[in-house]
Structures are given as structure tokens and as C-alpha cells.
């Protein structure tokens, strides 16, 4: 009996970890304030300090969780696995599969229960973390289809863009062969005071016919422009008809032997 009592180990007495790092065995009870290496900054003592901080944080977290459960702020729920969010990148929609909802089957629970418990305690420890997780899940939800229909560019914009719009370039009224920047005033364009036949020598019996007459020009303009544009150029056609009548009168007067009217001032 005495041998058995001697072989039995005594009660476990906690030892000082700092003293153990320095190859000493000192009981921890009443030794914390008198430890030689309580201010030591070696690598092993730094690891001990970090371990103590982590353990203290875990204890505080457990106390806070217990207080919240007593007050009824949050109730623990037994979840087989975390929520799964599946994103379909081909389409613009997201599929959420949660327990109790119809959707894609959830994967089997994590075989490591410690990691699941640690993640659950970290997520439910503070309400701010839960709110952050909810906001992230809400941001992944699909938007309405009208949003994509409104902001999505049309596929056939290049073909149907100018179908019912106005023409791209504004059509200018037909000119008399002059440049647009060197147009003459209207009082000089209405009457031709100097026809080409007035400067011919007297020996020629008949005037040289021009390359084209104003009547031919009017016919070519009428055939070139469609009928829908004739209403927009009524003033141009009226001017041409008047000028053709005036030129015909001047030609008849010149052929009868009269002198063409001169706009030069008489001395």
C-alpha cells in the first residue's frame, strides 16, 4: 500500500511559464509579482504574452455571448452548414441556397466541427458583424429585369438608329455654279444685264449657243431632287422661272436689233 501511494503522482501544481522557459520550475501561486522574467522580451516570452492575449480575448467573447443570450438579443441556432451563394456569371442573376428554401442542394457540413463553431461564434459575437454580412448578401441579390432592359444598349442601334431620324447632313439649295462663300446679292442675280452675246464681234451672224440653258438646268434640278423636297425650294424655282422669262425677253430684243440695256452710268 505504501508503495502504491508513493507511485501515485500528487495533485497537479501549475508552474510559471516564464521560469520554465528559462529552465526553472517554480509554482505559479503567489509567484506572479515576484517572477524574475516578468519583463523579459526574449522570443519565447513574447510568444507567451501573445498566447495570453488570445486566451483573454476568447474569455471576454464567451462572456459577452452569454450575456446576450440571457438578455434575449440573439438566440443560438443549430446550423448544419453555412449559407451557400452561387453566382451565375453567364447570366446577370444570383442563386441563393439556404436551409428551408427551394434551390440548389447545399453541400455537406464541414467535417471539422471546431472550425464551424469558431466561425459561428465569430459571426454572432457582435451585431455589427452580422449587419456587415447581411449587407454583403443584400448586395449580391439580383436587380429587377427592368433595370437591365433600361440600361442595356440596343444590339441593332447602328441599323435602326437613323431609320426615322432626320438626314445626317443638311441639303443645300442648288446653286448656279458659284461657291457658297462668294454668293452675289439678289439685285444682281435677278436680272442678267450682261449676257454673253453682247460681247461678240459684229461680223458673226448668229450668237454662239451656250453650253446649257436655264430651262435645261431647271429640268435637271427637278429630276434630281425628289418631289418631297419641291415644297422646301419654292422660292428657288420661282426665281429660276422669272430669270428664264427675263432672259428670253432680252434675247428677243437683241435678235430684233435693239441694244441691250446697260447699267453703266452715262456721263
UniProtKB/Swiss-Prot annotation:
Q: What is this protein called?
A: Doublesex- and mab-3-related transcription factor 1Y
Q: Which UniProt keywords apply?
A: Activator, Developmental protein, Differentiation, DNA-binding, Metal-binding, Nucleus, Repressor, Sexual differentiation, Transcription, Transcription regulation, Zinc
Native species: Oryzias latipes (Japanese rice fish)
Main localisation, per the record? nucleus
Any Pfam family hit: DM
SMART domains to which the protein is assigned, alphabetical: DM (SM00301)
Protein family (similarity comment): Belongs to the DMRT family.
Has the keyword Zinc been applied to this entry? yes
Q: What happens when the gene is disrupted?
A: Feminization of XY offsprings.
GO cellular component terms listed in the entry, alphabetical order: nucleus
Amino acid at each position: 500500500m505504501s508503495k502504491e501511494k508513493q507511485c501515485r503522482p500528487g495533485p497537479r501544481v501549475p508552474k510559471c511559464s516564464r521560469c520554465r522557459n528559462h529552465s526553472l520550475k517554480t509554482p505559479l501561486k503567489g509567484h506572479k509579482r515576484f517572477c524574475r522574467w516578468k519583463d523579459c522580451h526574449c522570443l519565447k516570452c513574447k510568444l507567451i504574452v501573445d498566447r495570453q492575449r488570445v486566451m483573454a480575448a476568447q474569455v471576454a467573447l464567451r462572456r459577452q455571448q452569454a450575456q446576450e443570450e440571457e438578455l434575449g438579443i440573439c438566440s443560438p441556432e443549430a446550423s448544419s452548414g453555412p449559407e451557400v451563394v452561387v453566382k451565375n456569371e453567364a447570366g446577370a442573376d444570383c442563386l441563393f441556397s439556404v436551409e428551408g428554401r427551394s434551390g440548389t442542394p447545399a453541400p455537406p457540413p464541414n467535417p471539422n466541427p471546431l472550425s464551424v463553431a469558431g466561425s459561428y461564434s465569430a459571426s454572432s459575437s457582435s451585431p455589427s458583424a452580422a449587419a456587415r454580412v447581411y449587407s454583403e448578401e443584400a448586395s449580391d441579390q439580383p436587380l429587377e429585369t427592368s433595370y437591365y432592359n433600361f440600361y442595356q444598349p440596343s444590339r441593332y442601334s447602328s441599323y435602326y438608329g437613323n431609320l426615322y431620324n432626320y438626314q445626317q447632313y443638311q441639303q443645300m439649295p442648288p446653286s448656279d455654279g458659284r461657291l457658297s462663300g462668294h454668293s452675289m446679292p439678289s439685285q444682281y442675280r435677278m436680272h442678267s444685264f450682261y449676257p454673253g452675246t453682247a460681247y461678240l464681234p459684229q461680223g458673226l451672224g448668229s450668237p454662239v449657243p451656250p453650253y446649257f440653258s436655264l430651262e435645261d438646268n431647271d429640268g435637271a434640278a427637278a429630276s434630281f431632287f425628289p418631289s418631297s423636297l419641291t415644297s422646301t425650294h419654292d422660292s428657288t424655282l420661282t426665281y429660276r422661272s422669272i430669270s428664264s422669262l427675263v432672259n428670253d425677253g432680252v434675247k428677243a430684243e437683241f435678235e430684233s436689233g435693239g441694244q441691250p440695256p446697260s447699267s453703266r452710268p452715262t456721263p
